[in-house]
A protein has these predicted regions:
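N-terminal assembly/interaction segments in proteins that build large macromolecular machines
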Residues: 1-216
């Protein structure tokens, strides 16, 4: 991860074949240089980025710098992807976990930037690293995903119901209520705003509620 002030950051994925190399100081230093280059690139895709001039030696490309590092490390390496995030009205925070195996960038809109806001957005980045939400809010879930999840949960509910003795089976309207409850629970687990905040003192506060509290 590389960051410029509060509003711009970049993250890169550079793969090695072994954990030994992944923890190597020379490799880590190179990955940081790649991230620094990704922070400044104007490239729209990986192919364009790899063709960029290597900041440390402009006579070479980023791709050629990788070839040089492979020769030093004596192991196959690859630059797999990069992302660059720039906040137009707010800040970008980063969080790196597991010795660099997981990296998260979070962009937040805010009119106020101070240490409390920076910490809050970084805490949200930590939340993403820990619980891997798929969407920001429930409104972001595509209809086809909703339909697929509903189909799966309905099949489970019907199977569970049919496995019961006939005199204990639930009527259709009860199954439908159960389905709504299960869907809501499922969506809360995959949507960042609705997830329980990992540092919630009461174990109940959602991420959205935490941010609302910080923003007061």
């Amino acid at each position: 991860v590389a960051q410029k002030e509060d509003n711009k950051a970049a993250v890169v994925e550079v793969n090695s074949e072994t954990d030994f190399v992944a923890s190597n100081a020379t490799f880590k230093a190179y990955v940081q240089k790649v991230a620094d280059a990704a922070l400044e690139t104007k490239a729209a895709d990986l192919e364009g980025f790899l063709a960029d001039k290597w900041p440390e030696d402009p006579s070479k490309t980023v791709s050629e710098s990788l070839v040089d590092m492979i020769a030093v490390i004596s192991e196959k390496l690859s630059i797999r992807r990069f992302e660059q995030v720039e906040a137009a009205n707010g800040i970008v925070a980063s969080y790196v976990h597991g010795g660099g195996r997981i990296a998260v960038l979070v962009e937040a809109d805010t009119d106020v930037v101070n240490d409390e806001i920076r910490e809050a957005v970084r805490n949200v980045a930590m939340q993403v690293a820990a619980l891997s939400p798929k969407y920001v809010g429930e409104e972001d879930i595509p209809e086809e995903v909703r339909a697929h999840e509903k189909e799966i949960l309905l099949a489970q509910a019907v199977a569970e119901n049919e496995a019961l003795p006939e005199n204990k089976r639930k009527p259709q309207q009860i199954l439908e209520k159960m389905l709504i409850g299960r869907l809501n629970k499922e969506f809360k687990e995959i949507c960042l705003n609705d997830q329980i905040y990992v540092k919630a003192e009461d174990g109940k506060q959602s991420v959205a509620a935490y941010l609302a509290e910080v923003g007061k």
